[in-house]
């Protein structure tokens, strides 16, 4: 970037993934978060804008605190990149914060931690009010067993058993710092905090934990699955509906705000 001509901005945004075909802009013009955001940014900047995201999300996956950076020669106040951009965005996307950052800041490569929540409804009948907002199973779940299995995820490990075949990550070794599983009012919440995640990793973990909770897989079997390092013997990938990117960690010097998880989630 020519720092004499352009400024680098970081924005935090939230979106409803059920309205879009994932994050990444596609050649066929289907609605994606990136395409909608870049169109809105261009309206404010008066020039084409290219964005770089902290982590791409798939179709149906939501975000409460995604982080993006972009460069522009346009000189605009902060509110132009928040309220102004929001005025040009379709329903389902909102910019929460904007901040001018150092020219070397990189939304993806400077991130040292990512937070995900999976919201799961466990009920005989799926609530129509939670469709696209939460995953669902009609099975009764043993939360204690699921919690024991989730604890086995913590640490630096090879997570090949939870890696999608099309994953482009250079290494399957990732570090999970926190894996909490709670239940209230029929909703199960899985919170994962790690340095990085493989493609479909959280959804594959959730699928395996549902197997544990329903008795189809023991805690010992879950541990063996991790050690197997093979996707071939793992339970199927769980639905995207309940998956939320809830935060990205950056060095404090960049001043990137990480919003609290909304109370409704």
UniProtKB/Swiss-Prot annotation:
Alphabetized UniProt keyword annotations: Isomerase, tRNA processing
GO molecular function term, any single one: RNA binding
SUPFAM superfamilies, alphabetized: Pseudouridine synthase
Positions bound to substrate: 116
GO biological process, one term: tRNA pseudouridine synthesis
Protein's job: Formation of pseudouridine at positions 38, 39 and 40 in the anticodon stem and loop of transfer RNAs.
Stated family: Belongs to the tRNA pseudouridine synthase TruA family.
Descriptive protein name: tRNA pseudouridine synthase A
Organism: Neisseria meningitidis serogroup C (strain 053442)
Gene: truA
